[in-house]
């Protein structure tokens, strides 16, 4: 078997969407599993919408996810360049080859004339499939002269054979496109830029791509691409069209379902390992049904056979759970480094590590850290009502806490025990009211952890504030 070569070919017209990230991930996993090559190609032929800033963001997001590529626009490779805007000469060269072989032809129709033809076919109840007979009448000597005078170039159309095309898709199975289901289609636009289907085939063919794994919204394009492979006499890659990602309500995933870009999840404090784990299970399943997986485990267990046909549901709650699991898998040194930017406070690592240890099991998104940890940096804004029982209880506790020389959990527990012997507040009431006195909140980390982290002076000060209010 020849070396597996797969690619991810995004358009730099926006931020990397989770659907695109999943496509990149499946290609990456297959390349790493087979010892093949993962190629990054930038499809920037949409001159109006493509922006350099989005290309930079795509590259940044893929690097953050840990999906490193073997060839690409930033590192080069044997089959570059890896930006379509730098390959336009190739598209013209191969279009000319097809014209010379009678497999493609020039069309001197203006875009609005093509649109009128489309509307006419639809009004007649016909599919808007163009043929050479429909398009070549525009190629009059007068029109050619007009184009020349205006400095315009003709579009180039591919002459589609009227035959059935059969695709053996590794996810969908056998897919048949009946003869006449697709008409002739443009290869080069009148502005000289290639269409998606054409550029895609030229690039995949010249870059020796062996497998094309992508979303099933591209399935309808495949017949045009296969026809072009046959026209050039190139081997057709193996196609695999993975299921669409749906929102929790069963409709196509969109911004109304919440965050959909990798950048948004990153800014909310999702770990790349968690997002990769989650995306891998949208359209693929582990042979043993495991759900928490490292990238290495994903590589080792990945196979095309386990890609599923059914649409995948994007469940934000499951992603939160996975993120919390991956957070707990991190060493404290790693977590301090990753989490510190989300804290928005200048704090030394040792103190922050103690706080993280106390709140780690409560973190779903690292962006929650300011809210989860504010009790360690701010005195409570609201204090519980002062009652005679509480005053007596916490005056006694304060006295016991002041006696402690070595501030640790054992000493604090001992102080609790002594204070409660004569306390008017017992058990649950003792601890719940003390939590409110120290934090102003009814829930949070273990109470003993709060006292230990705050330290003797701060605890004494907070209890004194309550008693003296």
UniProtKB/Swiss-Prot annotation:
Superkingdom per UniProt: Bacteria
Motif 'HIGH' region: chain residues: 10-20
Function: Catalyzes the attachment of glutamate to tRNA(Glu) in a two-step reaction: glutamate is first activated by ATP to form Glu-AMP and then transferred to the acceptor end of tRNA(Glu).
EC numbers: 6.1.1.17
Summary of subunit composition and partner proteins: Monomer.
Source taxonomy: Bacteria, Thermotogati, Thermotogota, Thermotogae, Thermotogales
Aminoacyl-tRNA synthetase keyword on record: yes
GO molecular function terms attached to this record: ATP binding; glutamate-tRNA ligase activity; tRNA binding; zinc ion binding
Residues annotated to bind ATP: 255
Organism in which the protein naturally occurs: Fervidobacterium nodosum (strain ATCC 35602 / DSM 5306 / Rt17-B1)
A single BP term in Gene Ontology: glutamyl-tRNA aminoacylation
Stated name of the protein: Glutamate--tRNA ligase 1
Stored SUPFAM superfamilies: An anticodon-binding domain of class I aminoacyl-tRNA synthetases (SSF48163), Nucleotidylyl transferase (SSF52374)
Enzyme class (EC, first level): ligase
Xref: InterPro entries: aa-tRNA-synth_I_cd-bd, aa-tRNA-synth_I_codon-bd_sub2, aa-tRNA-synth_I_CS, aa_tRNA-synth_I_cd-bd_sf, Glu-tRNA-ligase_bac/mito, Glu-tRNA-synth_I_codon-bd_sub1, Glu/Gln-tRNA-synth, Glu/Gln-tRNA-synth_Ib_cat-dom
PROSITE patterns: AA_TRNA_LIGASE_I (PS00178)
